[in-house]
Regions:
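C-terminal motif of bacterial Sec signal peptides marking the signal peptidase cleavage site
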Residues: 46-50
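Short, Lys/Arg-enriched N-terminal segments with co-localized hydrophobic residues
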Residues: 6-29
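Short helix-initiation/N-cap motifs at beta->coil->alpha
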Residues: 130-144, 244-248, 312-326
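Glycine-centered hinge/linker elements that transmit conformational signals in sensory
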Residues: 248-257, 286-318, 357
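Hinge/lid segment of periplasmic solute-binding proteins
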Residues: 75, 79-83, 136-139, 150, ...
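Extracytoplasmic/periplasmic substrate-recognition and gating elements
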Residues: 89, 122, 147, 347-416
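Conserved N-terminal structural module of periplasmic/extracytoplasmic solute-binding proteins
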Residues: 14, 36, 52-169, 187, ...
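Periplasmic solute-binding protein
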Residues: 165-181, 195-238, 250, 266-287, ...
Length: 428
């Protein structure tokens, strides 16, 4: 078997946008509007991602390539095709941070925490192997361990591991990941999940190889003060009229420039939205195909840069981040909940997020950004527990609601999110 090979895809995801957007203005009412916008874009993302969720999918950035093992090494470490017939006593989970660990600790029925790296589920010891993603360390560690999976002692085998959207196909398109149907998980079990979360981890043979508890729909995150000053309102439904499609968006950019605002911080802010809405793959019949929507991004971006309505900064750069503050004079960014919760200086005095100054609306097109998926490792000797964790943590509606309330995740369960949106007592 060949070692996992890197495949490009989209980036990362974590939480929904309710926590910080509207701290001081019509708080409960606006939060419901934000959640409504997220629900809308989640449905749009589900309709669109199928065009790009394969090896040939467009991507904003590829993860660093993990070293590929030699053919000889791969051939000598063939992974067992079937899970063990007897359940093991040690359950090994590989991930890159504490997020899933905290979800399992807090929400999986019967989980007992022993210490920072160990837990118990019944008679089974849960061991957490957490390697940060810095310098590709997580993937390197995971790759090296998967290559030894077939020959590993039962207590050392990986049972479950996590992947992100940007490199999911690297693992999905190998035999190191189990089809969820082989775990006994049916289409009916997953019927309430957003389709795009399935498309991202479906291999080239149509097998679903992972399941996520999260949804990461993206929205247009706008500066409410700028909206009031230039558009006359910061109401999401009214702001949406000024950004409802790309032509309207670019027309609004002219108004923002006249008032001293950049429409977006950088042309790179909009790339993911355009690229999530392509009609086909990068490679078709052996030929590179550049989608019309990507060419529209090029044309629209050039016009906006030439008109000095935006910049060309790299995402995550200091210049790109200046718009997190009022003096940065940026009207909007595009992203899911984790962007504002973790990346827009929400805890920093004087930032727009800290002052409750961001609003959200659907924007010109639906899109998603990121996500974390649970994969069962081929060769696991704990297939029944892998199945139960996936079902409990991604399909149990009560647990999904618990996660929304406790962790502010936008969960991958349509009835749960619709119920939370309608629940007048819910405030994040």
């Amino acid at each position: 078997m060949e070692a996992p090979q890197p495949q490009p895809y989209e980036d990362k995801c974590n939480k929904h946008l309710q926590q910080t957007f509207n701290k001081k203005w019509e708080e409960t009412n606006m939060k419901k509007k934000v959640l409504s916008a997220l629900l809308t874009t989640a449905m749009l993302a589900s309709m669109l991602v199928g065009c790009g969720s394969s090896n040939d999918a467009p991507a904003a950035a590829s993860s660093e390539a993990a070293p590929a093992a030699s053919t000889e090494a791969a051939a000598s470490t063939e992974v067992a095709a079937e899970p063990a017939t007897e359940e093991g006593k040690v359950f090994n989970i590989y991930c890159w941070n504490e997020e899933f660990k905290s979800r399992l600790t807090d929400h999986y029925p019967g989980y007992e925490e022993v210490d920072g790296t160990t837990g118990k589920i019944g008679d089974i010891t849960v061991k957490w192997n957490i390697t940060p993603s810095d310098d590709n360390a997580y993937q390197n560690n995971l790759d090296a361990t998967l290559l030894k999976q077939a020959d590993a002692a039962a207590d050392d085998k990986i049972d479950l591991f996590l992947v992100e959207a940007d490199y999911a196909l690297k693992y999905v398109d190998t035999d190191y990941t189990m089809p969820v149907k082989d775990l006994g998980i049916t289409d009916a079990d997953l019927a309430n999940q957003y389709q795009y979360t399935k498309d991202v981890v479906t291999d080239s043979n149509g097998n679903l190889k992972g399941v996520s508890w999260q949804g990461c729909p993206g929205v247009l995150i706008y500066n409410r003060e700028a909206a009031k000053a230039v558009l006359g309102t910061d109401d999401p439904a009214e702001v949406q009229k000024s950004v409802s499609d790309w032509d309207t968006f670019t027309a609004t950019a002219e108004k923002m420039k006249a008032a001293g605002y950049n429409m977006v911080s950088s042309v790179n802010d909009t790339y993911r939205v355009y690229s999530n809405n392509v009609s086909g793959k990068w490679v078709q019949d052996g030929k590179i195909v550049i989608d019309d929507n990507l060419m529209k991004w090029v044309d629209d971006s050039k016009k906006m840069v030439d008109a000095k309505e935006t910049g060309t900064f790299d995402l995550w750069s200091d210049d790109w981040s200046k718009g997190f503050y009022p003096d940065g004079k940026v009207f909007c960014y595009f992203g899911p909940a984790w962007l504002i919760n973790f990346s827009m200086a929400a805890d920093t005095d004087g930032s727009i997020a800290n002052q409750g100054g961001w609003g959200a609306t659907e924007g010109p097109q639906g899109f998603f950004w990121g996500g974390t998926w649970i994969c069962g490792a081929t060769g696991t000797d704990n297939a029944s527990l892998v199945k139960d964790i996936i079902l409990k943590m991604t399909t149990d509606e009560d647990i999904m609601k618990e996660i929304v309330v406790a962790d502010d995740d936008f969960v991958n369960n349509k009835p749960a999110m619709e119920a939370m949106a309608a629940d007048t007592s819910y405030q994040s």
